[in-house]
A protein has these predicted regions:
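ABC ATPase nucleotide-binding domains
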Residues: 81-84, 88, 92-235
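Conserved A-loop
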Residues: 11, 23-26
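ABC ATPase nucleotide-binding domain
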Residues: 5, 25, 61, 345-347
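Helix-to-loop junction immediately C-terminal to a conserved catalytic motif
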Residues: 50
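Non-catalytic connector elements of ABC transporters
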Residues: 243, 253-358
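The feature captures the beta-strand-to-loop junction immediately N-terminal to the Walker
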Residues: 35-37
């Protein structure tokens, strides 16, 4: 499977910037996700790769083929790109059976009847829909329609698979099963895949790498773990999962891989590791709720430990969500244990603090 290279992509609609210098590569057999809120430019990027949108600047290549080059005025039409596309709405044709929907791309390619039947049957078996070939879309569930749309995108062996929020119309349980099934299928087939979603759980569970977008720009690209544990911006930290953003001031410069900060003047020092800081610098810290350690107030505190007042608690099945207050500073923490309060000891490990760039 070829790789997709997007370089310097820009696009404006009526003077409103939709994309600005968007650059990334989808590697061979990789599952890459464009993640961001509504209006961030992720779908415009996907539609540009698919050939449904013509950018204003930049290049798009697939292997040794140029799909788009603004400078050389190259624009390959969507039907000539050999890409598989699954839309958010599935777009299965209601007047055709499951077999007819999946067979349509082969019919317009004028595949011989026997080869067509064999290929459609193989593809329906691949997506576990072989027993539904003669049913119509209105006789299928949302998850089944989704598989029909995927089969239709795969049946002609596309170079790359594109998916535009394909799970958004499914309920939570079905989405979870669909994610597991799609990831397994993508791995088995070795499909180079470009996926678009605003759902952080989908991005984390499916992706080999994630490209975080906002306001038409790429903010960060990396593995799910890298982006979650080492966010490059406040937006990324807050958008990908839950995160505490704490304002602190460095009281010592970084020495031997560690520096001391305070959350408020005269406060207890907070040691952070792996960050290059100068004394007096004001910084923002990203701290994940699950990285903070809770204990009963009577237990020994130690370094980076604070007394916190319990302001609220929510039971969420496999864990509790605690809303705490440290000398007027709010902090959200998750823990599997129950703490009755009214006060607890909070310890913030040095490695749990990520200093965000200014």
């Amino acid at each position: 499977m070829p790789e997709i290279s997007v370089q310097g992509l820009s696009k404006a609609f009526g003077g409103v910037r939709a994309l600005h210098d968007v650059t990334f590569t989808v590697r061979d057999k990789e599952f890459l996700t464009l993640l961001g809120p509504s209006g961030c430019g992720k779908t415009t990027t996907l539609m540009s790769v698919a050939g449904f949108q013509r950018p204003d600047a930049g290049t798009i290549t697939c292997g040794d083929r140029t799909f788009f080059d603004a400078r050389d005025k190259v624009f390959l039409e969507a039907q000539d790109r050999n890409l598989g596309m699954v839309f958010q709405s599935y777009a299965v044709w209601p007047h055709l059976t499951v077999f007819g929907n999946v067979a349509f791309p082969l019919k317009i390619r004028r595949m011989k009847k026997e080869a067509l039947r064999r290929r459609v049957t193989e593809t329906l078996e691949l997506v576990e829909m072989a027993g539904y070939a003669e049913r119509y879309p209105h006789e299928l569930s949302g998850g089944q329609q989704q598989r029909v749309a995927l089969a239709r995108a795969l049946v002609y062996s596309p170079a790359v698979l594109l998916l535009d929020e394909p799970f958004s119309n499914l309920d939570a349980k079905l989405r979870e099963r669909a994610r597991t099934w799609l990831k397994r299928l993508q791995g088995e087939l070795g499909l180079t895949t470009l996926f678009v979603t605003h759902d952080q759980d989908e991005a984390l569970s499916l992706s080999d790498r994630i490209v975080v977008m906002n306001q038409g720009e790429v903010l960060q690209a990396g593995t799910p773990e890298d982006i979650y544990r080492r966010p490059a911006t406040r937006f990324t930290a807050e958008f990908l999962g839950h995160c505490n953003i704490l304002t602190a001031r460095a009281v010592t410069a970084t020495a031997q891989g560690a520096a001391e900060l305070v959350l408020h003047p005269g406060g207890q020092p907070l040691t952070v590791s792996g960050e290059d800081l100068t004394a007096g610098a004001e910084v923002q810290l990203a701290v994940r709720p699950e990285a903070v350690e809770l204990s009963a107030l009577s237990e020994a505190a130690g370094p980076n430990a604070y007394k916190a007042e319990l302001r609220g608690v929510s039971f969420l099945g496999d864990h509790y969500l605690y809303e705490l207050d440290i000398d007027g500073i709010p902090l959200t923490v998750t823990d599997t244990r129950s703490f009755p309060g009214p006060s607890v000891t909070v310890r913030i490990p040095p490695s749990a603090c990520r200093v965000l760039p200014p």
